[in-house]
């Protein structure tokens, strides 16, 4: 019998779980207090549960975590963890400390099937979706270490391995817990889902969760984006921006979108590209994040130099587009944007090989 990992259950699902056991809803608050506030994961030590309930929980439920197989520290104080889900499945997460906040970059899949040509993870292929428990466990593992060092997580970004909107239900349930005051209690603005542009999922996300949205854009036209972000061949820039407008208008509170743009030397960094990008985003409430390309083994790309990026940024500024330039962090431990490869069993390529 497979036990239910309680880290996969949001508050509503925990209510249903305890009702099925013949228990009242207040048990949900109690178990969430133990897990997310006290950080106690042994049912036998949850003293406000009856002996019979503790015995039942031990039979049918568990609170289990991936194993930490490696922890790496960068010169700039970025921390990367490598977690083992099984013998062949590994994921990575990265903590980025700054003066006023601490951001945890978490994974949603083992590998990624979207094959963005400038991304290390995309070059590895796809193996599996993470469960909600495997997503939430990343936050709890990082929290445990950081709390011991009097550091904190103020922001969570789904910008690690995988495409979050190809694992919707697990990611949305995780967001429920990240926002829930009984769990992590983060503000909706402090949790960000980054997507390469899965249009139907963005439309569903606009109704399902109020967290922030980031779009991996990387090109101002379809011809170039088709090459850099192959999913664009299915969902064009025009369709993507239309979905973005639906997202912006769906909430009762003001929403914003961050457009990510990796700067690739002689590929997408010209004055013409900057002008086209400004024109493209003028009609939308957007901020652009210019990201210096982080090199990895066997890549065909190089990063634009600082002067080119600053010129690109100035053009966007002059046309009213809010723009920032991301500072590369954690590069010496392969923790920078686009470098999260992990150890991935590439089933996608194996399946394709069998077909031909």
UniProtKB/Swiss-Prot annotation:
Q: Which InterPro entries match?
A: Aldolase_TIM, Methyltransferase_A, RlmN_N, RNA_MTrfase_RlmN, rRNA_lsu_MTrfase_RlmN/Cfr, rSAM
Where does the Radical SAM core domain start and stop, copy by copy?
98-334
In this UniProt entry, which cysteines form S-S bonds? 105-337
Cofactor(s) recorded for this entry are: [4Fe-4S] cluster
Keywords in UniProt for this one? 4Fe-4S, Cytoplasm, Disulfide bond, Iron, Iron-sulfur, Metal-binding, Methyltransferase, rRNA processing, S-adenosyl-L-methionine, Transferase, tRNA processing
Q: Where is this gene product found?
A: Cytoplasm
Q: Where does [4Fe-4S] cluster bind?
A: 112, 116, 119
The answer to whether the entry has keyword rRNA processing is: yes
Q: Where is the active site?
A: 92 (proton acceptor), 337 (s-methylcysteine intermediate)
Q: Which Gene3D superfamilies match?
A: 1.10.150.530, Aldolase class I
- Note describing how the cofactor binds: Binds 1 [4Fe-4S] cluster. The cluster is coordinated with 3 cysteines and an exchangeable S-adenosyl-L-methionine.
Q: Where does S-adenosyl-L-methionine bind?
A: 162-163, 194, 216-218, 294
What Pfam family is a match, any one? Answer: RlmN_N
A molecular function GO annotation: metal ion binding
Q: What's the Enzyme Commission number for this chain?
A: 2.1.1.192
The UniProt catalytic activity note for this protein reads: adenosine(2503) in 23S rRNA + 2 reduced [2Fe-2S]-[ferredoxin] + 2 S-adenosyl-L-methionine = 2-methyladenosine(2503) in 23S rRNA + 5'-deoxyadenosine + L-methionine + 2 oxidized [2Fe-2S]-[ferredoxin] + S-adenosyl-L-homocysteine; adenosine(37) in tRNA + 2 reduced [2Fe-2S]-[ferredoxin] + 2 S-adenosyl-L-methionine = 2-methyladenosine(37) in tRNA + 5'-deoxyadenosine + L-methionine + 2 oxidized [2Fe-2S]-[ferredoxin] + S-adenosyl-L-homocysteine
HAMAP family membership: RNA_methyltr_RlmN
Q: Which family does it belong to?
A: Belongs to the radical SAM superfamily. RlmN family.
Q: Please, what other remarks does the record include? A: Reaction proceeds by a ping-pong mechanism involving intermediate methylation of a conserved cysteine residue.
Q: Per its database record, what is this protein's job?
A: Specifically methylates position 2 of adenine 2503 in 23S rRNA and position 2 of adenine 37 in tRNAs. m2A2503 modification seems to play a crucial role in the proofreading step occurring at the peptidyl transferase center and thus would serve to optimize ribosomal fidelity.
State what protein this is by name. Answer: Dual-specificity RNA methyltransferase RlmN
Task: Give the species.
Answer: Vesicomyosocius okutanii subsp. Calyptogena okutanii (strain HA)
What's the name of its gene? rlmN
């Amino acid at each position: 019998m497979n036990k239910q990992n309680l880290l996969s259950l949001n508050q509503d699902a925990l209510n249903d779980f305890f009702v099925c056991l013949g228990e009242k809803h207040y048990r949900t608050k109690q178990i969430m207090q133990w897990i997310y506030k006290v950080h106690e994961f042994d049912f036998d030590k949850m003293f406000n549960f009856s002996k019979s309930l503790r015995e039942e929980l031990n039979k049918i439920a568990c609170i289990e975590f991936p194993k930490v197989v490696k922890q790496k520290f960068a010169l700039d104080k970025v921390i990367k963890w490598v977690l083992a889900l099984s013998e062949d499945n590994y994921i990575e997460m990265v903590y980025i400390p700054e003066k006023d906040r601490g951001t945890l970059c978490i994974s949603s899949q083992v590998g990624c099937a979207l094959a963005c040509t400038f991304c290390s993870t995309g070059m590895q292929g796809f193996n599996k979706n993470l469960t909600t428990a495997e997503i939430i466990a990343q936050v709890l593992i990082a929290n445990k270490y950081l709390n011991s060092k009097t550091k904190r997580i103020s922001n969570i970004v789904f910008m690690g391995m995988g495409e979050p909107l190809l694992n919707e239900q697990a990611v949305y349930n995780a967001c429920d817990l990240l926002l829930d005051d009984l769990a992590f209690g983060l503000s909706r603005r402090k949790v960000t889902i980054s997507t390469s542009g899965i249009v139907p999922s963005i439309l569903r996300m606009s109704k399902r969760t109020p967290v922030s949205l980031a779009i991996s854009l990387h090109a101002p036209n379809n011809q170039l984006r088709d090459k850099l972000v192959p999913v664009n061949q299915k969902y064009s820039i025009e369709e993507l921006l239309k979905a973005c407008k639906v997202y912006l208008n769906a909430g009762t509170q003001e929403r914003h979108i961050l457009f990510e743009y990796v700067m690739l030397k002689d590929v997408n960094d010209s004055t013409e590209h900057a002008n086209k990008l400004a024109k493209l985003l003028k009609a939308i409430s957007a901020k652009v994040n210019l990201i210096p390309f982080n090199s990895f083994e066997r890549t065909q790309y190089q990063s634009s130099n600082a002067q080119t990026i600053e010129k690109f940024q100035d053009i966007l500024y002059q046309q009213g587009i809010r723009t920032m330039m991301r500072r590369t962090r954690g590069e010496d431990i392969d923790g920078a944007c686009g470098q999260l490869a992990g150890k991935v069993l590439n089933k996608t390529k194996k399946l394709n090989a069998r077909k031909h």
